Amino acid sequence: MESRYNPTEIEPKWQASWAKQGLDATPEDTSKPKFYALSMFPYPSGSLHVGHTRNYVITDVIARLKRMQGYRVLQPMGWDAFGLPAENAAIARGIHPAEWTYANMAQMKKQLEPLGLSIDWSREIATCSPDYYRWTQWIFLQFLDMGLAYQKEAAVNWDPVDQTVLANEQVDNEGRSWRSGAKVERKLLRQWFLKITDYAEELLTDLDKLTGWPERVKTMQANWIGKSVGAYLEFPIVGMDEKVAVFTTRPDTVYGVTYVVLAPEHPLTPQVTSKAQKKAVDKFIEAVGAESEMDRTAEDKPKKGIPTGGKAINPFTGEEIPIWIADYVLYEYGTGAVMGVPAHDTRDFVFAQQNKLPIQTVIVPEGGDAETPLEAAYTEPGLMVNSGEFDGKVSTEGKQAIIAKAETKGWGKARVQYRLRDWLISRQRYWGVPIPVIHCPNCGAVPVPEADLPVELPEDVEFSAQGGSPLAKLESWVNVACPNCGADAKRETDTMDTFIDSSWYFLRYPDAKNDKAVFDSAKTNDWLPVDQYVGGIEHAILHLLYSRFFTKVMRDRKLLNFDEPFKKLLTQGMVQALTYKNPETGQYIAPINVDADDPKDPETGAPLEAFYEKMSKSKYNGVPPEEVTNKYGADTARLFTLFKAPPEKDLEWEGADVEGQFRFLNRVWRLVSEHAAQAKGKKAKVNKAKLSKTEKELRRSIHIAIKETSEDLDGDYQFNTAVSELMKLSNALSDSKEKASPVYAEGVETLLLLLTPFAPHISEELWENLGHSESILGQTWPQVDEEALVADEITLVIQIMGKTRGTIQVPAGSSREDLEQLARESEVAQRYIAGKEVKKVIVVPGKLVNFVVPK
């Protein structure tokens, strides 16, 4: 046996052995309960840092634990391989996106394998493979057949750097692209959409089923879906047969409407605009058209508007009110128009003051005054005033009364509205899934026949930074015959949003190599839903919402028999590293070029800011996993990742802390190696009836470790405290004087079994050194002996006047009377109560005895 711990020797040895034995393969035995453990698959960007690997290690610990607990486990891996970076690399480096992508996949797989992840690589998928995207296209055709995919002209978010369209969810709060960081522009294009709004209510209500999800994620999704209950009201336009339709959650304020606002893009805008205002309105529309949606709706940005010269009639008051257009109203949202109630809406109040529009109070707090000019909008419920027949009604009741009158008079009706918009999936780039549609002058948009799938990406494409779809420029690929009538037709040249690929990949893994169907429903229904999903909080809305949507659609297509894809979700925190930045230039400096004791810019000598920030290439602070595994081994890297912080919290990467985990594993190595040398393979059964006091204490420590570790790993996965329990058990064994006892042998084996999910290589090596011929990976998770947890003695705290003065050992299970007697007779108590009158004794069984004596 190796006399010292040498991870660089034992880890490759056991990884090769496990691969040869096929221990990571997914079992076909359906007699065991299933457990599907899944990490969000990565985009193959080129290289990994330990921030990326944290979630794979977390998932692997769970997968290994569940195998030991008797489950058949599926833990697959794949690549979210389409996307703009590959195409941009093709432009910059003159290589094909496929070549760049597959090289990155190979590099990242090479980085992952030394970590000892128990991944079933036989199920590996890549979304850029025609074998996979054939079925992505097939799914799109199902959406098309169900009326859930459609085309329409739309004002879209245009990324001027990546030269493509972005979904609303891909634009941040500052109006910038989620990927390139470019300021997003508005552009009118004919686009493909998926009708996610058809599932808005179910996506919202089914959040209640997700008891294993963080509340934060569910709240983010609920807010994104944004259900509003209110009224649809119509305001007739003066001199026209048309009406301005609005949605409001405050129909009780309708008597306070003093203007209505249209989106500049609203089709009624040119109709209601007067000749006198046309020039100014056209100029305003042109200026607004250059702004992104986020710019237009930002709360901290002043709202701009202009009167059209048109008038509408408030049907409840009969009064004429002006029609304006404003930048903050978007045609894609709601009806594309809003009613202005400045007295009771903060934004309307500011807009009305800015543009000298009337402010009419129609809701007041109880005892309030409707005549006093408002200094700010009153937005709370109250009593209706200046509201005709509804005066004096509580506003909550008034809402229903107003809706009832609107329905009776034909002015409107009750309505539920959602913030969620249909999902725009068109992208004007090459490296994505071609949309399987052919445009025929006779037949319109014709789906590609299923027999002709996949519509493969052509390889002879020229890549340019000039924008537009590269596919559209390749006539040999674009020009085809219509599948219906045979006429000359053209392929759809847009590709799909890459979030389509990741919206169903988890359904493919149970049947990853099926070339006859998207998957065998029996296999997928057996393994799904995913029991534990692990990934970043940044995917709370996009990926997780879209995956839920796809699952529900495919259920309705009779392909699945479940409603939700992921039972439990763990959103791991970020891994942060020491980061250096020049505050004058804003440039980040690689730590390797900085003296940590005196951080200065190596070129200018300027002092640098030093702080912890999320690992990323742009900040030069990423630590590649091999930097750790080459020096300390995978088990140390895994333990540090798990021990430093709870999984949902951010983790600060510190080299000294990594060293601490390496020292712990060295202690385990020495402890087990010394025992193996003494035991020489001999086995001795623990005789619980004949244990000495110290053996009982040691056995209690062993079973406390089993209990605490099991509880830490059951539910919330508190890996950090579980590792702490292993350290406590290691210390108890090291301190024990019973090293020849069968109890000590039980403790050593228990330590290795509990350590296995965290540090499988060292556990396997030491298990073999103890004389075992079968892999520790196939052993059963230790079970708690409840009897062992019961102590013969407990520690009793002695207090005098509420102040702790010492402790004594007393028999467990002692009565209150016995505890008081033992405490009175103890040396600790006698020092304070001897010769004094004890006025009162407070006994807390199992914890303390407190004596109250005169001062």
Swiss-Prot record:
Its EC number is 6.1.1.4. One of its GO terms (cellular component) is cytosol. One of its GO terms (biological process) is leucyl-tRNA aminoacylation. Residues 292-311 are annotated as: Disordered. A motif ('HIGH' region) lies at residues 42-52. ATP binds at residue 617. It is found in: Cytoplasm. One of its GO terms (molecular function) is leucine-tRNA ligase activity. This is Leucine--tRNA ligase. It comes from Acaryochloris marina (strain MBIC 11017). The gene is leuS.
